[in-house]
From Swiss-Prot:
UniProt main location, coarse: cytoplasm
Localization in the cell: Cytoplasm
Annotated stretches, region: Disordered: 137-158
Keyword annotations from UniProtKB, A to Z: Chaperone, Cytoplasm, Nickel, Nickel insertion
Record-linked NCBIfam families: PRK13261.1-1
InterPro entries the record matches: UreE, UreE_C_dom, UreE_N, UreE_N_sf
Molecular function per GO: nickel cation binding; unfolded protein binding
Function according to Swiss-Prot or TrEMBL: Involved in urease metallocenter assembly. Binds nickel. Probably functions as a nickel donor during metallocenter assembly.
Protein name as annotated: Urease accessory protein UreE
Gene label: ureE
Family: Belongs to the UreE family.
Organism: Pseudomonas putida (strain ATCC 47054 / DSM 6125 / CFBP 8728 / NCIMB 11950 / KT2440)
HAMAP family: UreE
GO term, biological process aspect, one: protein folding
Length: 167
């Protein structure tokens, strides 16, 4: 089994030796057994706290295997709107519910949820249920390196991307 333990920013002269297609729920995990698109088995053993993005490159410790991550199409709700104020209102209401959100010019996307779809329609937006890669914003607690301090002592763990199961 190939163990992918490093993120590679520049492949240099190395050739990509495979791809792995993962949905967002898999791309938030730092430890995961996966099947590459060509059928080979691999394991992710990555630094915690980072969402894998479509297009990222992963390598084994020796650098002999270079694997490109692909974001799998999945059930999402997509809002397209030319009115920036209305789109900002939608983002506000979704953020208020801690919904992981992909934000692009004129577009919001989140894991499909008919209740949230209805809420947005109530604001006057058009919502489409579709299959598309989902690339949510990293969020306040996902950055590299993950370093911050507090003036008081207490034990806690910050999530980096919370992706609730929507039905």
């Amino acid at each position: 089994m190939i163990v992918l333990s490093r993120r590679i920013s520049e492949p240099g002269t190395r050739v990509v030796s495979g791809t792995v297609t993962l949905d967002v729920d898999s791309r938030i995990k730092s430890r995961l057994r996966v099947t590459l698109d060509d059928g080979r088995e691999a394991g992710l053993m990555l630094e915690r706290g980072h969402l894998l993005r479509g297009g990222e490159l992963l390598a084994d410790a020796e650098g002999t295997q270079l694997i490109r991550v692909l974001a799998a199409p999945e059930a999402v709700s997509t809002v397209r709107c030319a009115d920036p104020h209305l789109l900002a209102r939608a983002a506000y209401h979704l953020g208020n519910r801690h919904v992981p959100l992909q934000i692009e010019p004129g577009l919001l996307r989140f894991q499909h949820d008919h209740v949230l779809d209805d809420m947005l329609r109530g604001l006057g937006l058009t919502v489409e249920a579709e299959q598309a890669p989902f690339e949510p914003e990293a969020g306040a607690y996902q950055s590299a390196p993950h370093g911050h301090s507090h003036s008081h002592a207490h034990g806690h763990d910050h999530p980096f991307v919370r992706l609730p199961a929507h039905s």
